[in-house]
């Protein structure tokens, strides 16, 4: 880290942590009792804090593994010995929530290290761009909000980013172990451990593909036609996978992830599924429109990079040149929206989430809207893919497979499910110009201000309950 860049980084981290501490104080004053999912997480963590680890003490409404509680106890328990605090203080709601604030500091540092690793250091990428990119992602609204509640998001992000960083540095055993830690926070994080393995495979495939293209006499026969490149890559993959040398090399590199995969399969067999506890509200289904919702979500939060007159012009030009393909894609998308759109009971009933109002006032009110939005979905998907064109075709393939696997089976539309894939995506696009980063950061700041203000000040009550309710992501 260059000296000047070190100053930028330290200033950004210090200011972010200071603001976070002030917000944490405001949250602590406003929320004296557990809120939303905290009514399950906090009592369970407190039981662990008291030393009650038996299964009979487990809340069956909790559907994730106890990673958050175990790490929390490991962090706050030493305070009893170091500071002489009582167990009541150490296991309080405020202390447990503070663990996520510590995770947010770790996430800030990991994001910076990942930007330095993923984005090569060159004259085109200045130190201010890396620090601004880090700051922007650290205050990404849907992630930043949950730093102040006792949810699994911050810890899940920490271990997944750490696993990705270790993978990029070639420490695959450490990466797989951290992937297991991430899995202990949220079971679907196993997909991002697979992504780390896929990253290794994509790197080796890219190297072999470049070698193939550089040969004077291509071993593959010339192919002509509209899908020539696709068929050529498919032929290459088939030839590559037939080589024992190639497969053994990949096996030696990825065996820690393969072992983790076997452990996950064993867990699923023994548990009878991926979800623990109450499964009635977490049934898997083929919810293909989740991809479209993610594309829209990404377009909204990355609009300085994905939405511009030149982008729209390029897209329209491409549509005209390949209008038959566009027509087919549109037809398939409309069919997927028609046959595979689901509305989870929580989405329809819980008016504390923003998704409730998006669904009720847009999709539920106007039946045709979900079809009229298909061209916008296609543009968003194309713009996302276009922004990743600096990555290899094999990396893109691995990323979109993992994206599909992690969000399509989810019946419930909830923005929290989009956080990790969004951050992975945002890390891997080329560093934008400083002006766009400032625009993005400013928009995030405005969104954060609005959501925090609404959450803390615009409360309401249900007719059948005296509890204070709040609007949130």
Curated annotation (Swiss-Prot):
Pathway annotation: Protein modification; protein glycosylation
UniProt EC number: 2.4.1.256
The keyword Transferase belongs to this UniProt entry's keyword annotation: yes
Reaction(s) catalysed (UniProt annotation): an alpha-D-Glc-(1->3)-alpha-D-Glc-(1->3)-alpha-D-Man-(1->2)-alpha-D-Man-(1->2)-alpha-D-Man-(1->3)-[alpha-D-Man-(1->2)-alpha-D-Man-(1->3)-[alpha-D-Man-(1->2)-alpha-D-Man-(1->6)]-alpha-D-Man-(1->6)]-beta-D-Man-(1->4)-beta-D-GlcNAc-(1->4)-alpha-D-GlcNAc-diphospho-di-trans,poly-cis-dolichol + a di-trans,poly-cis-dolichyl beta-D-glucosyl phosphate = a alpha-D-Glc-(1->2)-alpha-D-Glc-(1->3)-alpha-D-Glc-(1->3)-alpha-D-Man-(1->2)-alpha-D-Man-(1->2)-alpha-D-Man-(1->3)-[alpha-D-Man-(1->2)-alpha-D-Man-(1->3)-[alpha-D-Man-(1->2)-alpha-D-Man-(1->6)]-alpha-D-Man-(1->6)]-beta-D-Man-(1->4)-beta-D-GlcNAc-(1->4)-alpha-D-GlcNAc-diphospho-di-trans,poly-cis-dolichol + a di-trans,poly-cis-dolichyl phosphate + H(+)
Positions of transmembrane segments: 7-27, 65-85, 98-118, 131-151, 152-172, 176-196, 250-270, 284-304, 324-344, 368-388, 393-413, 437-457
Keywords of this entry: Endoplasmic reticulum, Glycosyltransferase, Membrane, Transferase, Transmembrane, Transmembrane helix
Role this protein plays: Dol-P-Glc:Glc(2)Man(9)GlcNAc(2)-PP-Dol alpha-1,2-glucosyltransferase that operates in the biosynthetic pathway of dolichol-linked oligosaccharides, the glycan precursors employed in protein asparagine (N)-glycosylation. The assembly of dolichol-linked oligosaccharides begins on the cytosolic side of the endoplasmic reticulum membrane and finishes in its lumen. The sequential addition of sugars to dolichol pyrophosphate produces dolichol-linked oligosaccharides containing fourteen sugars, including two GlcNAcs, nine mannoses and three glucoses.
Entry protein name: Dol-P-Glc:Glc(2)Man(9)GlcNAc(2)-PP-Dol alpha-1,2-glucosyltransferase
GO cellular component: endoplasmic reticulum; endoplasmic reticulum membrane
Ranges facing Cytoplasmic side: 1-6, 86-97, 197-249, 305-323, 389-392, 458-473
